[in-house]
Every structure is written in structure tokens, then in C-alpha cells.
Amino acid sequence: MLITEYLLLLIPGLVLATILFLLLRRTHPLLHLFLFITVFIFTRDAMTPLGLWSIGNGSFLWIRFIHDPVTLLILGLSSLGFVFLMQSISPELAVLVEWFEGNRVAGILTGIAGAVIAVLPLALIYRGVPLENRGGTVPLRLLPFILFIALSGNLYEEILFRGYLYGWLTERERIKPVPAGLISGLFFSFGHVFLAFNVTDVGISILVFALWEGCLAGLVRSRFGLIPAVLTHGLAVFLLTSGLL
């Protein structure tokens, strides 16, 4: 089973990460954040060679998850587990997370609108490319599971970049919200370099889209908090992986 192979592949890295964390003092939040982001990148990029997801061909970007609901469910639950773990073991990072700011309804609507804006450039490009050349159709029965992994997986990613990193920039470095959101987007794009050029051959397309999406999520975060940013990122990924575009 692929999910078993994936978990076995992660064990050495997770063991090393655990040892490193235990050697660090709880008062070293920046080192915690570096370790958490490294673990995320390693767990995300390990999905590709096993076929748990597919990301484009050549320089053309499209995304599809594996067509296995059990695997998608396990991956989504694992992402939530990582979020709970990080929040529990690094309280100095946890206090930096603002789940909502301002009007919640406006935040949710803005997060949804952000997802539409994020995928709009690719949607326009896709109009001239047959569906079978960009991942193919997706069974309707998988859509709830894809939505779950898109939201839970990107909660894991967003709490790192728009939760901890953004919070550190605004609270500790005293950077204003909008610049902090844009900086988080730059870091987010940088976190895709290995995926773009070493794990896949999609290259610059991944970095450009990650920068665009990351900056949008950062701007949403700067005004409305983390959950709306998760909606922007997670729903954008859902739209790209669902075959609905």
C-alpha cells in the first residue's frame, strides 16, 4: 500500500527531527519554526516520487491527488495531527497565531474570493488545453476527500507561513501587516524551490504560482487572520486538483 511506503519513507527524517527538537530548549521558537518548515517540505516532497500526487509535465503546471479516498483521508488527518502537535510542543509559536481578525463573515468571504483570484490565471490558460493533457478527469466521489486534504493539508502549510512566520514578523520584528504578508509569500515561494527543480521538472511555473498564491494568502491574513488565508490557499488547491477547471 502506497501510504505504508510513504510512512516508512518518512521515519528516518522524523526520528532525526524529534531528536533535534528534544535537544532544543523550548525557548528557541525560531529554531522550532525552521525545524517545522523543514519537516513540512520533506513530508510534502516525499509524496511526489510515490505518486501520492502529480504536479504538471514539463513546464506546464497542473495538480492531481491520488484517486484513493482512504489515502487522502489518512494524509488529511496526518496534517491535522502535525498542526495539533506543533501547537502543543511550541507554545511560543502557538501564541503568534491569530485565527480570525475583524469581521469573520467578511473574512470567510474574502478567503473564498482569494481562492478564485489565485486560480484565475491558470483557469484562463487551461481554457486552451484539453483536460486529458492536464491531469484528466477526477471521479465525483473523490471530491469530498480532495476538499478535506486540500483544507487540512493547507492548514498545516498556512500555520507555518501565515501563522508562525507572519506572527513572528509582526510581533517580534515589528514589521507592518501588509509587508509581513508579502514577505511570508516570498518565503512560501522559496519553500517550493526543491519541488520545482529537483523533485519535478515543472520549474519556474511552480515558483511563480506559489509566489502569487502565497502573497494573496498573506494579504488575506494581514486583514482577516489565519482561517481566511487557509480558505484562500486550500480552496485554490481544491479547484486545481478537482478537475472542475
Task: Give the positions of each predicted feature.
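Juxtamembrane helix-loop-helix connectors linking adjacent transmembrane helices
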Residues: 55-70, 82-153
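Short, solvent-exposed coil/turn linker segments
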Residues: 19, 48-49, 92
